[in-house]
Amino acid sequence: FNLINNPDGDYSRYIFFYINYLIENNQIEEAKAISNQLEYLNSTLLLSQSKSWVDNKNFKEFGKIFSCNNYNDIISEFLFLISNLYSSQEDIEKSNFYLNLSNYLNPKFILNSTLVAENFYLNDEFEKAKNILKNFDKKYEFYYWFRLKKEAQIITKDKGYEEGIDYLSSKFSKIKNPNEKMIFDIANFYKNSKNYEKAIEYYTEIISSLDDSLEIKSDLLYRRGGSYERLGDYQKADEDLKYSLKINPDDAYVLNYLAYSWLERDYKIEEAMEMLKKAYALRSNDPYITDSIGWAYYLIENYIEAEKYIKKAVELMPEDPTVNDHYGDILWKLDR
């Protein structure tokens, strides 16, 4: 099924509706075949929940929220897609308008309420968001986890990261047999709150179970390597980041992270420069990568080349203090 691993867009809802169609037409084995191609770690909420239903033979759950033979359900989906588009453009008012129409036509599709909660969250209407999140109880395990994460994010906004992570870790500890997606998310939450030791603990739990053929392992090694780097354990950081590049040698962000780490340590400058040239060739309009290669030229005292890249980085990201500091240092060296 070509849409599952298609890198050119998010086809998760189409995959959900195809699985729904197969089940509705009693083509269970075909639905299982599609589900077996999905991975919890890199699937959307809707597909993760769908995979869980298929894996646990809860096929009736699909028909409870959507029917391919119901015209209202179909029209509702088109309206939801329009709403989602406006939400991605942060036009919350228009998004809510189409979302209300969608929910009116198909109130059964309770899982679509995640977009309602997201819109309230983006609008800083946290109490309204929390009321919507109550729709997701434990029978929808992935949506229940979404609820807990969003509640933790709201607490973080109100009271800071420490309160937010305390809430999420408390809820996480009560989940029996958390799946790898939940472990991945809690690791990311710890990393974002700068509790790198705990993040490493959970990343390691997942990494040890993954085969090198899975690209998601490359991402996990990148995240764990970044955590080691923040702790100053450069040996383990370098091991993880190089292992990540062994799996996916064309990941511009891993190339940039490892190279910039080496630059900061005044370590393997020439090799770091080659990695940055490759990263820049892959992502020439990324401000962080552009800044990194400019700073690499600065460190080898090629200030003319450095100025060219850092100037572009400033244009791409004018408010960033680090980029502006780098630009100031280069202009000083050039007596400008």
Region spans (language model):
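Register position in tetratricopeptide repeats
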Residues: 24, 88, 122-123, 157, ...
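TPR-adjacent "capping" and linker segments in tetratricopeptide-repeat scaffold/adaptor proteins
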Residues: 4-6, 63-78, 211-218
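Residue-level recognition of tetratricopeptide repeat
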Residues: 11, 20, 44-45, 75, 84, 109, 118, 153, ...
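TPR alpha-solenoid repeat register
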Residues: 14, 47-48, 78, 112, ...
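Structural marker of alpha-solenoid helical repeat scaffolds
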Residues: 6-7, 41, 105, 136-140, ...
